[in-house]
Structure formats: structure tokens, C-alpha cells
Amino acid sequence: MLFGCPRNVFYGHEKFMDMDKGRIQSLIKDYPDFPKQGILFRDLTPVFRDGHSLAFLGEYFYENFKNTHIDYVAGIEARGFVLSTVLGLKFNRGVLMIRKAGKLPGNTVKQKYDIEYGNAIMELQHESIKKNEDILIADDLLATGGTAFAAAKLIEELGGNVIGFAFVVELSALGGGKLLREKGYSVHSMVVY
């Protein structure tokens, strides 16, 4: 039951799916020249503030991955934590947090990756994944794919299987979706610019 309607009534028709995708797209706010000149920042904060949109994100990605075995949903710091929590609840699975270096206690595995102005390191607690567990990676936005690919390598280094990626937004001109798909990953993006 969702919003007083059985799921198959509310989401069973393409019209409702398109309306809700349109609602999400309309909530995304653009900030030109942020965080620096020449960058168009797509802010998903209004999407995450809207309860209807959060529920729809869960439904949308559930439909894309419902026939896929998932042990955990991994969120990439920080906005990926919101989507991974929504999906973890929807799939009744735990959530893993992929964080910037130095933010997790205990033994961690680290992965270096390139960013616009240099490089950074992300990490995951070593005991988070057992060999051959199936992990869905979630993040708010896919741009060049460097962060997402580094997250996949981190999970694979621990013996996990990356069964797919879920992104609210994909910036197709920056090539991240192409990169991940060429590496053999399943990529699902709700809104593609």
C-alpha cells in the first residue's frame, strides 16, 4: 500500500511512472558556477526533502532490481547514504557506508581515485563484506564515473560482487555511465541529462 493505493495500482501504469519521474526532475535545482566557475551543480536536496519522491525512488529502483539477489546496498558518502538507506529499507537489506578516508574506525580497505582537482581516498570497513556477497551501489549523481568505479573496486577487493549501480541523476556528457557499462556493470539512472 502506498499513498492509500496498492502498489500495482499506483505504479502499474507508465503514466504514473512518468509523472513521478517528472516530479523528481522538477525538484532538482540547478546552481550555475558552483562550486566553481563553469560547473552546473545539480542539487538533489529538494528531492530528498520530499517524502513522495523518496518513496518513488524506492519503488523505481525496486522495479529495476527486484529480480536481482542483493545482500547489501552500499552508499557513497554523503548523498549516496540517503538513497542507499531508502533502497536498503525497500529491499529489507543492510546498508554499507563507503566513506572518505579517516572517517571509519577499525580495519579498513582503501581505494584511491581521481577527482577534478587531484585525488582522494575512500574506504570501507574490512569486515563489511564476506566473499561473494552481492552489493548494489547507490549514489545521487553519476558524472565521470571515477568515484563509482573506485567504490566498485573497493567492494571487489573485499571479495564482493557488484550487481549494479543506482543513480538518481546521470550526466551522460561526462561519460560515467559509458565507463561503467563498458566495464560490464549494470547501471540504472532515473534522470539522464
What is each of the regions a protein language model found here?
Residues 1-193:
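PRPP-associated nucleotide enzymes
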